[in-house]
Amino acid sequence: MMAQRNSGAPDNAGGSNDGREGGRGRRDNRDDRRGGRDNAEKSNYLERVVTINRVSKVVKGGRRFSFTALVIVGDGHGLVGVGYGKAKEVPAAIAKGVDEARKNFFRVPLIGGTITHPVQGEDSAGVVMLRPASAGTGVIAGGAARAVLECAGVHDILAKSLGSDNAINVVHATVAALKQLQRPEEVAARRGLPIEDVAPAGMLRARAEFAAAAAQGGSHG
């Protein structure tokens, strides 16, 4: 009788271990699937790290170092955001910047890969002027402004920095300019005029061609 009880104990213990291992395996699989969905969602966006700085704070025991990262995130189709992350390690600072940028998303009105009208944005000492450009011009802009424009999906534009060359100021001035953009319909409604009186004929023609091309591509798909 004793032998039977002793021989049965290890079998039960082994079964409980198998159950625990199976539970851990199922949890790991769920985490892997959840991580895969998160990675797929993040991969749909363009990310640009504009600048990384090391900052120090004097404390009682000496200096404490950390890193800051200025990050631009966009979908390349008119949606863009800017984030600023701070952490003890560079990857963590970038990750925080990405999360903040996605919380700050805003929509940029575009027509055929360029902006709807000239605009100038200011933030602190940064001043950035943006002008529409014809197809094939490309993004004529400095590094900091270029990162914002490319993530927003602008393909043809003329940009010039008129103020501070500090990357943070340039980025925020570029964002301020983009947030001032309006669609021709909005301008026409505000002025109480037909859209043909407030938008150049070339812009309206380009918008019509772009819409027709998009509709044709959708029908083939």
Curated annotation (Swiss-Prot):
Q: Does the keyword Ribosomal protein apply?
A: yes
Some GO term, biological process aspect, for this entry: which one?
Answer: translation
Listed GO cellular component terms? Answer: small ribosomal subunit
Pfam families hit by this protein = Ribosomal_S5, Ribosomal_S5_C
- Write out the function statement from the record: With S4 and S12 plays an important role in translational accuracy. Located at the back of the 30S subunit body where it stabilizes the conformation of the head with respect to the body.
Q: Give the family from UniProt.
A: Belongs to the universal ribosomal protein uS5 family.
| Name this protein carries in UniProt | Small ribosomal subunit protein uS5
